[in-house]
């Protein structure tokens, strides 16, 4: 299941915005929303979540809804829905997509529904039903510990990654080890542990982390134990804020086992080193199977890791209406240096501190006016040289311009 189009009307600051996630007859697997504060990034994520939560929706007249989505279903999903409808005692006529979502909701909350119900049939034909996973920006990371090694998670259609969910991470890892021990009877417990460790570390390999999962504590808590390159060991609660953010957010999504699902992540760059920001989307893509990932970000490092067709730059018109640029409306983003992304994609006028940029511009103007020998030029140049150093690219280019000007003016005077 994937979103093909989003249409939001009169939700917070968004008056009327339509975004198409279909490019060249293919639904995008990764969508990156960017823009200044107040441009509607988080509102879009929340509106998508609310749509599946039946908020602000008019199913009889979708065009009157505050949020309306065009949903793309794989052929096997369409077939499963049709078969479930045939076997249930509910439908007499044509079913709607909203009935499918309602069935997923009902199955989440009521496990005692009768066998002939549409909900049971949906569960029967969808061994792994799709999920909506929302990862908000603000999460409080408290102490976590292993509560059980037999963690059971019932299916839920709408999932929010919050501190309560994150508390289950140690229990999830311990349960994963126990589960593998029951199906891999020929392996020793040490081999089972190594298998779990490799499975989890494999998610983060692309980040080249200094810290890796090593195993479990020897006491009854069986806490996940990490080790750094210096050989120092510590449990998950002693990770740095960036490491903890990375592991808890990512493993929370993995714990939900998304397949054919939609994952909404607000500001994944929080507390992450720029090197990790450049590769974090690849980490999320390795979790689960055939998911659609929609991200809201301020990070130029994340924007530089995807193609411009995956990027939607949100901006506010003079009349207050929020619009979006994408694809051919943007410069190429993938693989570009950060300063290019900041200027060409995010619209930043300069990557320098405004005062320094202003002083450089004044130097350029003095050169253009042939005032490079004046006291004003020499004083400004000396000040900037002391601040920026003699390897600064802009000062080097100004030097080159001065030399060219001197040569041209010298030739003119000699004639």
Language model feature labels by segment:
Residues 1-58, 217-355:
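Switch/communication elements of ASCE P-loop NTPase nucleotide-binding domains
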Residues 25-27, 124-126, 131, 143, ...:
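Acidic, Mg2+-coordinating catalytic modules of nucleic-acid enzymes
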Residues 46-114:
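Conserved P-loop NTP-binding catalytic core
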Residues 51, 172, 179-182, 359-369:
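Solvent-exposed, amphipathic alpha-helical segments
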Residues 89-208, 342:
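Coupling/switch segment of ABC-type P-loop NTPase heads
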Residues 196-200, 280, 337-338, 380:
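Generic structural signal for hydrophobic residues
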Residues 211-215:
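A short acidic/basic microdomain associated with nuclease active sites
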